[in-house]
Amino acid sequence: MTYDPIALLSHGLIDLPWWGYVVVTLALTHVTIASVTIFLHRAQAHRALDLHPVVSHFFRFWLWLTTGMVTKEWVAIHRKHHAKVETEDDPHSPQTRGIDTVMWKGAELYRAESKNHETLEKYGRGTPDDWMERNIYTRFSWHGVGLMLAVNLALFGPIGATIWAVQMAWIPFWAAGVVNGLGHYWGYRNFASADTSTNLVPWGFVIGGEELHNNHHAYGSSAKFSSRWWEFDLGWTYIRILAFLRLATVRKVAPKLHLENAKPTPDLTTLHAVITHRYEVATSYGRELKALLAAELGKLRERAQRGEIKPVEVPSIWRLRRWLATEPAALPAPERARLSAMLAASKPLAKVYAMREELSGVWARSTESSEQLLARLQDWCRRAEGSGIEALARFSFQLKRYA
């Protein structure tokens, strides 16, 4: 077989129609997405699954070719993000660094933190440290992307450079920008985790399931990111296929909430279930009180219009429920100020918010014994049922069904 040198220069070894190059680009970038979410994120950073050595090394090699990222660096930075989430020490929180910075300069934040030796030593333990990792993937971390460019040019000609450029931008935009930025700024929340994480959309196709960021922050060690029947995690689908082929072993998934007939009073089983599902509890609290919250917000607006109280910036019911489902420290300062002003103007809202804070104290007081925490939960339920607020009584009844 002979090759025309001019043809090789114009379209490389493989000549495709325009849409063929689009398909190739999407396929290559999707393998990179799968490598990040399955290998780097779920297997390495959170130990949610074990991968067969062949699969693991394929992912390592592919990430070396397409991103230049070092496994230890990525894992350490991500673990630090979870440990220091929404604080000044969080490597990429839009709450402290600004959404524009994280969205468009996320890769720069990653590179800066990767030079922090303390971060790598403290949070990067347990990552691959074999000969290939030390002498190839880490020592020549950026040579892989150069090899990828050469391969693309040989296969596709000049258009290969465009494909390569898209490959280089894919993870910095979708992972470092969209997930780390928008995933803590915009979207919906299933769980009231102690941060501002959100689910971007219910269907995790484009970023392999990483779109379900709030679910992940609620149960960080779970190999499965979807939690509601209408949600879809493509990364989990791949993991199940690998497990079926005996190429992966799932170590942990998020626990499922079990309900039984309500008990007269909470017991230790109830307590443990409440602590395990604490983020679900906090979210359900706002959902159960939705009608009460809406009614009180309406009263605030009417009183402000009549001049009975100082005008307050009354939030939407959606925003108020989100405030109830977020720890105060995780709220931006302007929103905390709005919340304080609103609570000062409404005793019922102040009451339900204070009860919410007391309930979260049940799982926040790690130094107390189980018996002490159980006494707190039992007391909370008694006061909720005797508060005269029907929604609180209903919620207490619901808690006593936890098992």
Model-based region annotation:
Residues 43-44, 181-191:
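A cytosolic-side transmembrane-helix exit/cap motif
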Residues 1-178, 222-403:
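Non-catalytic, topology-defining segments of multipass membrane proteins
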Residues 124-131, 186-212, 216-219:
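Active-site-proximal inter-transmembrane loops
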Residues 39-40, 80, 170, 182-185, ...:
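Alpha-helical architecture
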